[in-house]
Every structure is written in C-alpha cells, then in structure tokens.
Amino acid sequence: MGKVIGIDLGTTNSCVAVLEGGQPIVIANSEGGRTTPSIVGFGKSGDRLVGQLAKRQAVTNAENTIFSIKRFIGRRWEDTETERDRVPYGCVKGRDDTVDVQIRGRNYTPQEISAMILQKLKQDAENFLGEAVTQAVITVPAYFTDAQRQATKDAGTIAGLEVLRIINEPTAAALAFGLEKQDQEQLILVFDLGGGTFDVSILQLGDGVFEVKATSGNNQLGGDDFDGCVVCWMIERFQQQEKIDLAQDKMALQRLREAAEKAKIELSSMASTSINLPFITADETGPKHLEMELSRSKFEELVGQLIEATIQPMIQALKDADLKPQDIDKIILVGGSTRIPAVQNALIKFFNGKAPDRSVNPDEAVALGAAIQAGVLGGEVDNLLLLDVTPLSLGIETLGEVFTKIIERNTTIPTSKSQIFSTAVDGQTSVEIHILQGERTMARDNKSLGKFLLAGIPPASRGVPQIEVSFEIDVNGILKVAAQDKGTGREQSIRITNTGGLSTNEVERMRQEAEVFAEEDRRRKELVELKNQADNLLIIYESTLKDNGDLIGEQIKVLANEKVAQIQSVMTNPAISLKEFQQCLDDFQQTLFSIGANVYQRANTQTDDELEVMSDGSSPSDIEHPISGTLIPQFNFDFDDESTAQADYEAID
C-alpha cells in the first residue's frame, strides 16, 4: 500500500502533507513554497497554470484566472450572488441551478477547477515521495453542507485520488495540536478563520481520543471578505480624488485585490502601510496613480463588523457543548486571518484575557492533521480515535411546510436514526420525501438536499399507513436516506449526491479528461525541456562555426545546416511528437560530434605542418595561427647541448 497524503484544500491557499517516521511533514511544491495558491489560470494557447504561476499572471489575465472556487462548490446559483459579483471571471448557471465558470467559451464545474488544484498537490507529493499517490484524506470546513462535502469528494475523484476520508478542518488542526499531548485531558477550542470560511470547534482530548463536542461557523466569512473591505475603501477614495470608478476595470480590480491582501498582511506587524499602484488607470488628462496610506486603526474600523461576526459562532458552540469560556483549556488559532491583531484581541477579550496557544502553524496545521488521519487509515498510527460530529441538523419536510429534524446538529458520526411518519390525506398512495439540512423551523428556510418518491402505498385513511424514514451519515459526513412502507415492505432510498448534477458517469468522464489534461501538461513540460536543449545545441553550433569555421569541411557544413533547419522547424511545430523532436535532437547532436572530431583532426594536421616548417629553420613566431580556441600539442624538445650550463642549487634559509 502506497502513502496516503493529507490535503488542506483551502479557499485562497492549499497545502499537502504526509506522515514520515510517525510525524507529519509539509511537502513543498515545485516552486519551493509550503503552501500553494488555490488559483487556476488559462493562457491564450490553451496552457493551464496552477498555483503561484497562475497568481503571477492574474493581473494581465483576470478574466481567465479562477480563484476562491471553494466559495461556489456544492452551492446553488441563487445562494451565490454576492460571491459572483466579486470575481472577474464569468459565472454561468450550471445544471440544477449550480454555478459553473466560463473560460474561453467552455464551462467548468467547481469540482473540475478544484480537481486541477488537487492534481497539482498530488504531483508535488509524488515528486517528493518518488512514488505514485492514489489515496488521500481531504479536509473541508466544519460547516460545509452535505452537498459541499460530496462535491469535494467528487473533485478528489476527478483528480485521480481515492478519497479515503473527508474530515473537518478544525478537527484536523486539533489532531496536529494534540498528537504529542494524547495523555493530557483537556478541552480545546479551535478558532479557524481561513480565506473563505470560519469555523469554531470544541474538542475533548484524552487517552488518544479526539472527540468533537460541538461545532459552529459561517461559510461566508474569511480573509477574502477582509480584503474586500479594503478594496471598497480604495475604490471609494479613488473615486473621490479622481472621479473614476475602478470597479468597472477588471484589471485594476485585480491589482486592488492583490494590494489589499498585501496591506492586510503588513498591518499585522506594522502600524500603517503605503499602497502605491502606478498607472492604475487613465483618462483624457493622462495616466493616474493610486497612492494611499492605510493605518491599522482605519483597517480595524473597516473590518469591525467582520470581527464581530466571529463572536456569535463561539457563543453557539459553547452553548451546544454546555460549557463556559473559562472551561476551555487551550485556544488554537488556525488560518492565515488569525494573524490579524484585532481578531486576536477580540478572542482574548471574549475569553477574559486568556491568550491563544501559538504552538501550531496557522497555515499548515490543517494539512498536518489530515496527514495524521491519513496515517491512521494507512495503519501507521495506532491508538488514535477521532469522533467528529455533523454540523447541521438533518430532517424532512412535513405537513404545513414544517422542518422536522431527525438527526440533531453536533451528533457524533457515523450515525443512523429513523422516525415513523404517516400520510396527510385519505387514500394517499405515494409520499414525497424532501430532505433538508439546517436549523430553521420552516422547510423553505433550510438547505434542500434532495427529494425522492415512495410510491405503491395501499389506499387508506390518513394517519393509518406507517412510513419509516431512516437517515444514515457515514464517517465522511455524507448522507443516505431511506423510506419504507411498514405495511408492504416497499422501500426507496437515495444517497445524497446532488452536488451540481454530477452523476457517477460524469465524475468518471471528468476524471478521464483530467488525466488527459495532466498528460498534456506533462507533454508541454517535456516539450519545453527539449526546446531548451535545442537552443543550447544551436548556440554551441553557432559558437563553433564562429571560432573554427575554417576548420570545418564544406560537406559537413551543408549537413549541419540541414539539421539546423530541421531543428528550427520542429521547434515551431506545436503538433510535433516528443519522439520526433527527440530524434531530430539526437541527429543534430551526432552532427555536432562529427564537427568536433573534424575540427580536432584538421587542427592536428595543421600543427604537424607547422612543425615541418620549423624544422626547416623557421621560428614559431613566423607562423600565423588562425586557430582560436583549439588545443596545441605539448612539444618536448631536448635543450641539453654544449651551450647549456648545468647548475646545482642550494636552499638558503
């Protein structure tokens, strides 16, 4: 069995880790970074960039660079209006009212884009481990719905990974924190403020058991929103100064986003920062530059409501766990946004002066925890048990559009529960089971997960038929619902996979397409390497021709020029196969070897001629040397004659 990797698939950055020698370690990407931007860029020629390379070209290719795709995965069109307005790339309605992105006339699902990021992480892990990677544990925000969890799992499948487990991000961070502290009984609160989501989880640690007591959160709160506040402030100020609305310029908007993120990071360690964006736009009077000063106090004023929004989920989680702030032993910070001083101060104030524990890296803790869980599943870690919970209540719609809960939130998973229902009208022969997730009283206010029909119920008076509805949640938090007529034994079930209309066949098709694209990426990389080799050989040939052209025979020059023409032709042919390119390269290299041999042979012949001339009485200085850069043989003349004086030497201290 190969290594199982742990992946933190984040909104703004992703990270991959593996267990080595019983300890989790982060795997650096091919660019040397320990985290990889969750960004995918599409070039004009069809090339696809992922991670740091995609981020570098985002300003000049804003409409074809996809970021924050995690905010769309497994969500409906009508639920994402705010997110769609923020991004420069095109969003279109997918099947079943989901959100797809449109790039150069082609639609991609969020699962496909996420799979491209996962493929990059998978490739980096394979390069590090030196072996193929086929299995992974992937983390999701604790407050992800069933549809979002299933969509994330589909993304892993498309990327060519068998997703052994989906675990919650705060739970993974707790694993990273508590791996070496399993003998200590303690209650910890994980405060996870990432790029796009916010989660709070309370866990009890002890005797190798990590038990989640309660979880709460907000899937629409994260670092992106903090950046957005700064962007809005810059747009407003620039409009006041220059009477130009930068919100209408997608390239300018992308520059503003990058500047806002940079300013936010700098203000975590500085009292103020300068924002300078030359040539941000232009009008009839000429180019315009953006120059602003942003103080930490002003930043905290801009994001005050967002910081306040982190308090209620903590109150809710403590209430659900029947705990008070003083009962918490450790507070763990996870996610880059927890570095913001105002966030930390709000947390310290809420816990009456208790400072958070800083023993884990906020950017890497989740991936490290995922690697630990991967080690558990791979048999590398013993005596560790993870007991997670379902973050939201699950149930069905009943008479009067009421949401009837079957599994309450914060129930430990895996779990299964059932409840008996009956018909609402006389003679009813079928019932529609409408499955919902949420906490509101009315069905319409909760998240719809799916519907199915149980037909063939014998006609009877209302309230007589007995229909048992069973809910089963697996270890990944993914739901299966069944309904059975107790009178006839007739049964119908559904596994909730309504994550954007992706059937099993479609997921498999996308996986095969991703493999083809990965192969195409590999081919492009090898093609670039071959072109670089060809460029080097052409430079060597030109240098040889310049320095030793008179020593190269005309016949071999003609042959070499033919090979040069062939090389130049294949370098400009995008359809050339790697095998053909390599063959042309090998042929040209052999020609260069022949030229080298020819140069040395002629140089030696010319040197022999010079020696003959010198034996006729000529001085070596009388001979012109047209050869530059060629080797001259070493001459061993015997100078011991009558005019040579022999001397003894004595060393003097």
Curated annotation (Swiss-Prot):
Keywords: ATP-binding, Chaperone, Nucleotide-binding, Phosphoprotein, Stress response. The modification Phosphothreonine is found at residue 197. Pfam families: HSP70. One of its GO terms (molecular function) is ATP-dependent protein folding chaperone. It comes from the Bacteria. Induction: By stress conditions e.g. heat shock. InterPro entries: ATPase_NBD (IPR043129), Chaperone_DnaK (IPR012725), Heat_shock_70_CS (IPR018181), HSP70_C_sf (IPR029048), HSP70_peptide-bd_sf (IPR029047), Hsp_70_fam (IPR013126). PROSITE patterns: HSP70_1, HSP70_2. NCBIfam families: PRK00290.1, PRK13411.1, prok_dnaK. Acts as a chaperone. Belongs to the heat shock protein 70 family. This is Chaperone protein dnaK3. The lineage of its organism: Bacteria, Bacillati, Cyanobacteriota, Cyanophyceae, Nostocales.
